């Protein structure tokens, strides 16, 4: 019976404490700015139901406030507590009145650098970031300075670095603080030989992917770049390049071992999609990321939709000198088109030499052969072409599948002449640009521009794939896909020799991954620039940032067009650049 009475007493005490806690609110007065923010951070671990007016809780709050102020140089605050009665409706308020007191000021920042750090520009630059004498102490500055010393060591290869001394001295009587740091970076390590394990690709190709030479000073960014370059080849399923520290302590020359595992020899991808331009589409792709020890690769794909059916291949041959940025590419395929007033069967074969520059630009020279049998409107022709061309392009982006910043630029020139067997003389210039910029996180702007020009004396022999048509999702919305072009006398589309289109789109982040869009597109496809016929479309849309890329739905109408006035809608999935 006595035990039961004791248990009941304990229970009543617990319930009483909980009731008090639930009826008391903590409030801090006397602080502002960074001091208030720091103290709030220290107090954030206290739950609202833990607040009580007792001495133990007040001591806990007192300690938290002092820690928050101490970090910013206030070591001798005055803290008084006052328990106020509740307002008409509410809880009692425990007030902590804080007077920060006199701050501790920086009295000296003594930092001694030894080893390679004495002459290293990054370490010397770091010395200039020390707080000035007389400024209020911030312990975070001191800790961040030490972290920066260590960070430079890891980044630049001072792997034997150590702090001989690291003290933050406080003289409370003087209200002064003194840094006292003695740091020895030791000798900087250098890159040694890179050994690869598990690779199916010849070693000389892998060695030419290494972005540094033996004996170069260590830089962590160079090691990261080697990992990136190996992964970018597409040859490997996994890549890990790691330094061998146990072999470098005496010589300070750091050998590296790259452990790789080959990617699966064959991969097959299938997909079903829909776009307003071509309707439902089925696509299948077969990839061989490596075919031999020279790193050759093959991609074959087929795509089937109602107006277009394609079958193509791409065979890539990296060059030993620079396997990632320089390569030959042989491409070929067959395409059948039945769209609007175009019916064509086209067979192509292209040999290209590519250079990917460190600036991000990609250059290529092409030699193209094609055989086209086509009916464009009222004209039927068979044309064989053999012509060279040059191309330069660059794509940059930041922010994932729906970039917050980016641009894509592509320029090409092709030239055909009957002197080497082509059926028609022509020169073609094309330019495409897309720019994406985001302001204040929620405001996104997308602009597009396209320019095309064909110069020829026999336009009827130019295949439809080289002629210009406007209209559609990536051209002028409000019009059907490839529906804008000069026409024959019977009203059938002929195609144009000149093209210019532009688009301005504004997107607003409504919530989460959802964006609203408004846009205006304009341009023309003509054969005589003296007979300008600009078309303009405008509309609204929705964007969803899905895990596989942006999905969009647009509604657009032509502007001031007496012949076209219906509503067009566009559904699409895929990158904007």
UniProtKB/Swiss-Prot annotation:
TAM-mediated outer membrane protein folding is significantly inhibited by darobactin, which acts as a competitive inhibitor of beta signal binding. Residues 244-577 are annotated as: Sufficient for outer membrane targeting. One of its GO terms (cellular component) is plasma membrane. Keywords: Cell outer membrane, Membrane, Protein transport, Signal, Translocation, Transmembrane, Transmembrane beta strand, Transport. Residues 187-263 form the POTRA domain. GO terms for biological process: protein localization to outer membrane; protein secretion. Its main location: membrane. It is found in: Cell outer membrane. InterPro entries: Bac_surfAg_D15 (IPR000184), BamA/TamA_POTRA (IPR010827), D15-like (IPR039910), POTRA (IPR034746), TamA_POTRA_Dom_1 (IPR035243). Residues 277-278, 307-308, 337-346, 371-386, 416-427, 454-499, 524-535, 558-567 are extracellular. Residues 22-106 are annotated as: POTRA1, required for interaction with TamB. The chain crosses the membrane at residues 265-276, 279-288, 297-306, 309-317, 327-336, 347-356, 361-370, 387-395, 406-415, 428-437, 444-453, 500-508, 514-523, 536-545, 549-557, 568-577. Disruption phenotype: Not essential, cells grow more slowly than wild-type. No changes in permeability or outer membrane integrity. Loss of cell aggregation when adhesins are over-expressed in a double tamA-tamB deletion mutant. It comes from the Bacteria. Residues 171-250 are annotated as: POTRA3. Residues 22-264, 289-296, 318-326, 357-360, 396-405, 438-443, 509-513, 546-548 are periplasmic. The keyword Protease does not apply. Residues 1-21 form the signal peptide. Residues 107-170 are annotated as: POTRA2. The keyword Phosphoprotein does not apply. Component of the translocation and assembly module (TAM), which facilitates the insertion and assembly of specific beta-barrel proteins into the outer membrane. Promotes the assembly and secretion across the outer membrane of a subset of autotransporters, such as Ag43. Involved in the assembly of the outer membrane usher protein FimD. In vitro, when TAM is reconstituted into preformed liposomes, it can promote the assembly of several outer membrane proteins, including OmpA, EspP, Ag43 and FadL. Contains 3 N-terminal periplasmic polypeptide transport-associated (POTRA) domains and a C-terminal 16-stranded beta-barrel transmembrane region. The 3 POTRA domains seem to form a rigid body (unlike BamA where the 5 POTRA domains are able to move independently). Upon substrate binding (Ag43, AC P39180) the 3 POTRA domains move away from the inner surface of the outer membrane by about 30 Angstroms, which would deform either the outer membrane or TamB and may provide force to reset TAM. POTRA1 is required for interaction with TamB. Possesses a dynamic lateral gate, which may provide a different environment for substrate engagement when compared to BamA, explaining how TAM may be more effective than the BAM complex in the folding of certain substrate proteins. Belongs to the TamA family. Interacts with TamB to form the translocation and assembly module (TAM). This is Translocation and assembly module subunit TamA. The gene is tamA.
């Amino acid at each position: 019976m006595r035990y039961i009475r004791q248990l009941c007493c304990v229970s009543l005490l617990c319930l009483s404490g909980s009731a008090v806690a639930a009826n008391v609110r903590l409030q801090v007065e006397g602080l502002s700015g960074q001091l208030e923010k720091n103290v709030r951070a220290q107090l954030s671990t206290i739950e609202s139901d833990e607040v009580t007016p007792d001495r133990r809780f007040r001591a806990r709050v007192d300690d938290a406030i002092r820690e928050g102020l101490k970090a910013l140089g206030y070591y001798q605050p005055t803290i008084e507590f006052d328990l106020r009665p509740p307002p008409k409706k509410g809880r009692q308020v425990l007030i902590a009145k804080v007077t920060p007191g006199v701050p501790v000021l920086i009295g000296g920042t003594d930092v001694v650098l030894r080893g390679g750090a004495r002459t290293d520009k990054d370490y010397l630059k770091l010395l200039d970031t020390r707080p000035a004498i007389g400024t209020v102490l911030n312990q975070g500055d001191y800790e961040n300075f030490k972290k920066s010393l260590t960070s430079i060591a890891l980044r630049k290869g001072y792997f034997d670095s150590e702090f001989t001394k690291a003290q933050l001295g406080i003289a409370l009587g003087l209200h002064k603080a003194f840094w006292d740091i003695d740091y020895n970076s030791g000798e900087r390590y250098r890159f040694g030989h890179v050994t690869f394990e598990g690779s199916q690709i010849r070693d000389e190709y892998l060695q030419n992917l290494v972005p540094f030479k033996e004996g170069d000073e260590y830089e962590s960014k160079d090691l990261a770049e080697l990992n990136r370059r190996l992964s970018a080849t597409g040859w490997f399923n996994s890549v890990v390049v790691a330094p061998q520290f146990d072999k470098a302590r005496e010589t300070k020359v750091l050998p590296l071992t790259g452990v790789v595992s080959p990617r699966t020899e064959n991969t097959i991808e299938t997909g079903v999609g829909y776009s307003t331009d071509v309707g439902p589409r089925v696509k299948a792709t077969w990839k061989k990321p490596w075919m031999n020890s020279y790193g050759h690769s093959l991609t074959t794909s087929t795509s089937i939709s109602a107006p277009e059916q394609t079958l193509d291949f791409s065979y890539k041959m990296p060059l030993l000198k620079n396997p990632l940025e320089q390569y030959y590419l042989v491409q070929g395929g067959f395409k059948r088109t039945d769209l609007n007033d175009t019916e064509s069967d086209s067979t192509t074969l292209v040999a290209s030499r590519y250079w990917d520059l460190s600036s991000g630009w990609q250059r290529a020279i092409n030699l193209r052969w094609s055989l086209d049998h086509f009916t464009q409107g009222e004209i039927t022709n068979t044309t064989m072409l053999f012509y060279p061309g040059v191309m330069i392009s660059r794509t940059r982006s930041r922010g994932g599948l729906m970039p917050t910043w980016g641009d894509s630029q592509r320029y090409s020139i092709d030239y055909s002449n009957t002197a080497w067997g082509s059926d028609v003389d022509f020169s073609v210039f094309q330019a495409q640009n897309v720019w994406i910029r985001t302001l204040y996180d929620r405001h996104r702007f997308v602009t597009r521009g396209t320019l095309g020009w064909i110069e020829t004396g026999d336009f009827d022999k130019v295949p439809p794939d080289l002629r210009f048509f406007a209209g559609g999702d990536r051209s002028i919305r409000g019009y059907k896909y490839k529906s804008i072009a000069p026409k024959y006398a019977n009203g059938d589309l002929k195609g144009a020799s000149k093209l210019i289109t532009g688009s301005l789109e504004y997107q607003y982040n409504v919530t989460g991954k959802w964006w609203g869009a408004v846009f205006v597109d304009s341009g023309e496809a003509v054969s005589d620039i003296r007979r300008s016929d600009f078309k303009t479309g405008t509309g609204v849309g929705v964007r969803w940032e899905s895990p596989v890329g942006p999905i969009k739905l647009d509604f657009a109408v032509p502007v001031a067009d007496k012949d076209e006035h219906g509503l067009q809608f566009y559904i699409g999935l895929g990158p904007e650049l």
